[in-house]
Amino acid sequence: MACSSSLSSKWASWGASSRPHPSVQPFVTRKNVVRYHKPTSELSYSPLTTTLSSNLDSQFMQVYETLKSELIHDPSFEFDDDSRQWVERMIDYNVPGGKMVRGYSVVDSYQLLKGEELTEDEAFLACALGWCTEWLQAFILVLDDIMDGSHTRRGQPCWFRLPEVGVVAINDGVLLRNHVHRILKKYFQGKPYYVHLLDLFNETEFQTISGQMIDTICRLAGQKDLSKYTMTLNRRIVQYKGSYYSCYLPIACALLMFGENLEDHVQVKDILVELGMYYQIQNDYLDTFGDPDVFGKTGTDIEECKCSWLIAKALELANEEQKKILSENYGINDPSKVAKVKELYHALDLKGAYEDYETNLYETSMTSIKAHPNIAVQAVLKSCLEKMYKGHK
């Protein structure tokens, strides 16, 4: 994947290989993205326009189609029709979708930092970097679903649950992770911040996988011990498992692209890590109290004996009798026992406890953000906070 000297022509020259085939019918439609049910090996595309649209969604998805096309036609590997179709379908199934908060945050943040309209090259690079965060997210989720034995993700069966996929999903997840560095090498290798980007993605991946390990080993089969499920342990899990890649990574990408040294932005990192933990705690809350039809997945934290914010808070608030009920029912895949746990959550008013946490988090974060000396950085942090705040409403 050799790098071209100019990106401006890419919007036209890559159009012939970057748009979905007309026979590929959308099967999930969202406000921000159309996903495709099956790939095709027959190429018959219309060219992309050379003028950047004012619609971020459209621009972002155009870049996605370009990146995907280049990956499945990568000359470093001799794809045949079967392997190309498999990879295309796998990418379409797992990468776009969800809220795409991470990807959009890279572009939004870079725009706010620059303070003026982006050039075509800048817009393309920002979108490409945004998609790198989404590709990393896909890698993490594919493997996370396998480890958790999950059934649905974003309103459809988890990738590994498809009969023709199964354990091949493990290899697919690793492939998605490698795609990130293929994209970075192609478009950023000549940039002065390229090494810092590589280090950022590698460090973020290490932190996330380490957090996943903590989350997994604390609930090994036959070793349930709710006395260990403290708010301290939950904070450690959410910090490493999700905070860095969900919140810090996208903004750090934008800062690097803008020419900033991340070592000069320790305060920004601290704020973003705290917001990232809030994002993960919000996910814990929605796992039990969210509507599966709205959020696209069926919560299983109780059955899986996860050290979620809810169970840690419940154990903090519960009396001895209530702790006994939790011990007897938590972590068991039985609807009646799950119902008892949820009933106790309501009795302890965990909804109210979460709302108190959320309100305090917002106020504290906003105070820290307003204290930052750089107005542009303030705007980036405020944008990040507003995107997350009350995301369950």
From Swiss-Prot:
Residues 1-18 have a biased composition (Low complexity). Its EC number is 3.7.1.-, 2.5.1.67. Residues 1-22 are annotated as: Disordered. The record marks N283 as: Required for catalytic activities. It catalyses: 2 dimethylallyl diphosphate = (R,R)-chrysanthemyl diphosphate + diphosphate; (R,R)-chrysanthemyl diphosphate + H2O = (R,R)-chrysanthemol + diphosphate; (R)-lavandulyl diphosphate + H2O = (R)-lavandulol + diphosphate. Mg(2+) 2 binds at D144, D148. Binds 2 Mg(2+) ions per subunit. It comes from the Eukaryota. Changing N283 to D/G: Abolished terpene synthase and prenyltransferase activities leading to lost production of chrysanthemyl diphosphate and chrysanthemol. One of its GO terms (biological process) is farnesyl diphosphate biosynthetic process. GO terms for molecular function: (2E,6E)-farnesyl diphosphate synthase activity; chrysanthemyl diphosphate synthase activity; dimethylallyltranstransferase activity; hydrolase activity; magnesium ion binding. PANTHER family: FARNESYL PYROPHOSPHATE SYNTHASE (PTHR11525:SF0), FARNESYL-PYROPHOSPHATE SYNTHETASE (PTHR11525). This is Bifunctional chrysanthemol synthase, chloroplastic. It comes from Tanacetum cinerariifolium.
